[in-house]
Swiss-Prot record:
Record-given protein name: Signal recognition particle SEC65 subunit
Physiological role: Signal-recognition-particle assembly has a crucial role in targeting secretory proteins to the rough endoplasmic reticulum membrane. It must be involved intimately in the translocation of a wide variety of protein substrates.
Summary of subunit composition and partner proteins: Fungal signal recognition particle consists of a 7S RNA molecule (scR1) and at least six protein subunits: SRP72, SRP68, SRP54, SEC65, SRP21 andSRP14.
Main location: cytoplasm
PANTHER family attached to this UniProt entry: SIGNAL RECOGNITION PARTICLE 19 KD PROTEIN (PTHR17453), SIGNAL RECOGNITION PARTICLE 19 KDA PROTEIN (PTHR17453:SF0)
Entry's localization field: Cytoplasm
Species: Debaryomyces hansenii (strain ATCC 36239 / CBS 767 / BCRC 21394 / JCM 1990 / NBRC 0083 / IGC 2968)
Superkingdom classification of source: Eukaryota
Signal peptide segment: none
Bias (Low complexity) ranges: 248-258
């Protein structure tokens, strides 16, 4: 007898820790990262002493992320991978004012903002000297058009689970200070441009001007997204999706010859 399908409850924490990539849903997607998807990239901010990952670059606190600050997670040692599991995951949709808690928002509505980006969340953690990693290729399943997430170390298991910073003892406290930072650093088109600190794809290095994207009815989505988002209409691989279909010349069907009218003779009696 065939097995019946089984429904399984999935907790929010399980969703938060999923390694989600939009290209996994449909390998035929015409996006900047699919079907030829680049390897995952992680940028790392300044860490406290002693460094948790000695092989990582250590940029100065106020400097933007540069190419030399991007590391390949596939080169992590076993010890570094173990340390990475101690980090808490934070997604941009946690701060999206257009979302309800059911849709993924994790802060109060008064603290939420428009168009939150993972890069700005990473900047907030850097600002407060929290150990943080920016994963550009990871995506929340409810926010697939806004790629990027942050891993931040809040409690150190090597120190009996003590907070890394006594000012922020819980994840809730960290979310609130990030929300405050996002309020004072609103997302603009410059946030995704060449001066954002995120290296642009080669096709964007010259002549690229960031622009807002149109909202799709029924979707909770940013109007400003990272350039490697599948929703970026400027990319040559996705622009054709938004282009109108070319009009096909209409071919008139040949007309059948008119039938001669039948003559009817009426005879009066």
């Amino acid at each position: 007898m065939a097995k019946r399908p089984v429904l399984e409850d999935v907790l929010d924490d399980e969703i938060d820790n999923m390694d989600m990539d939009i290209a996994q849903f449909d390998p035929s997607l015409r996006t900047p990262i699919a079907p030829v998807q680049p390897g995952p990239q992680i940028t790392r901010s300044q860490d406290q002493e002693p460094p948790l990952f000695p092989n990582f670059p250590h940029p100065e606190q106020d400097k933007s992320v540069e190419r030399k600050d991007i590391v390949d997670p596939n080169k992590f040692s076993a010890e570094e991978r173990a340390e990475l599991k101690k980090f808490q995951i934070i997604y941009p949709c946690y701060f999206d004012k257009s979302r309800s808690h059911k849709d993924g928002r994790r802060v109060s509505e008064s603290k939420a903002v428009s168009n939150p980006l993972a890069k700005t969340i990473s900047d907030a953690c850097r600002h407060y000297n929290l150990p943080v990693m920016l994963e550009l290729d990871k995506t929340h399943p409810q926010d697939f058009g806004n790629p990027g997430r942050v891993r931040v170390l809040i409690k150190d298991n090597n120190k009996n689970g003590m907070p890394v910073d006594s000012r922020f003892k819980t994840k809730r406290a960290v979310l609130n200070i990030i929300a405050d930072y996002l309020k004072t650093h609103p997302t603009t088109l410059a946030s995704i441009g060449p001066k954002s600190g995120i290296p642009l794809p080669s096709e964007y290095e010259t002549g690229f001007e960031p622009g807002e994207i149109p909202k799709v009815k029924g979707f909770k989505m940013n109007t400003i997204v990272p350039v490697h988002s599948e929703l970026t209409i400027k990319h040559p691989m996705t622009k054709s999706i938004y282009d109108p279909e070319p009009e096909q010349p209409q071919v008139k069907a040949p007309q059948a010859p008119k039938q001669p009218k039948k003559k009817v003779m009426k005879i009066r009696g």
